[in-house]
Amino acid sequence: MKTKLTLIPIFLLITLTLSAQRHILSVPELPGYVTLKCDFHMHTVFSDGNVWPNQRVGEAWRDGLDAIAITDHIEYQPHKQYIPVDHSAAWKIASPIAADYNIILVKGSEITRKMPPGHLNALFITEPDSLVKDDFMKAVEAAVAQGAFIEWNHPGWKSQQPDGIPRMYDVHRELIAKGWLHGIEYYNDVEYYPLVMDMCRDNQLAIMGNSDVHGVISEEFAAPVYSHRPMTLVFAKERTMESLKEAMFARRTAVWYGDNLAAPEELAAPLFQSVITAGIPFRDDGKRIWFELSNTSDIPMKLSGGPEGAPATLTVPAHGMVVVRADRKFLAQPVTYAVDNIITGSNNVLKVEISPAKK
């Protein structure tokens, strides 16, 4: 009877948790693709996390995500005195809940070593037990043999890189040469590593951003400091596991954290254009024009560097609009701005041209 009395409140809590409202996210789109909101790095009690696996699904559903990976550590099992070591347990527990709530659940594990090589997530694996190997390269090889996407986690984490600067070591270069490294975390938890943008560009790797959550997500990323968890935006052909995986290997990813978007140069411009619209001038006094600039996304767009005769700075609020007043010459000559919160490199942001729509 005691067991029954204990279990009933637990199941009621799970039901109430998952029945909460889902937050619908409005993010930039890449023409011809579906934007999947993803978090590929999180933990449960089956390694060093503090929550049961099904809670990760409930949190993801409420936060408006499309896909997640529970990536408990292979080598680090601080709860093993109380919870048996089972590298597939979290995925098995979370899978039926994910199916009920239309969350794509990627099977993954975190290979956990000292730097170098550091910590790496193996995503889309089938047999995590095969990653239990003394030799690091053998562990990665086993993951790759299963079709895994290998992500280098928090390369500037100060526990492993005291100065916070990510560096490529010989082992990482070897992984790249073998085709065994596919992405690097630009953003992890509450940290970002600017040099990762250049590393990914120079080595043709995907830019990744994840929460690395261990506790309750709403507590670790609580308002008003955080409006949402960090996430990877994946531009897939369809909302399926297969399309998700294809897009990640094709490096069609961006990272959304706070009010910022980090994306490769070739993706950044179309992403901006997908949410920003300039209207037809509604006033023209012969010297100046007035037109509206609107934003359909959750991300405010922060523009700077406007030339003489146009606003020096503009912030187009999330789901908002601003009126732009500029010299009439800009009817034929676009205004060039830097988008300060769309990052394309360690020292680079997106440059765009703004002009009113034609009648």
Pin down the residues of each PLM region:
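Hydrophobic h-region of N-terminal signal peptides that target proteins for export
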Residues: F11-S19
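A metal-dependent hydrolase metal-coordination microenvironment
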Residues: H23-F149, N153, Q161-P162, P166, ...
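Amphipathic, positively biased hydrophobic alpha-helical segments used for protein targeting
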Residues: P9-F11, A60, F330
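Compositionally biased, intrinsically disordered low-complexity segments enriched
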Residues: T15, H43-V45, V335
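Bacterial N-terminal signal peptides that target proteins for export
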Residues: M1-I8
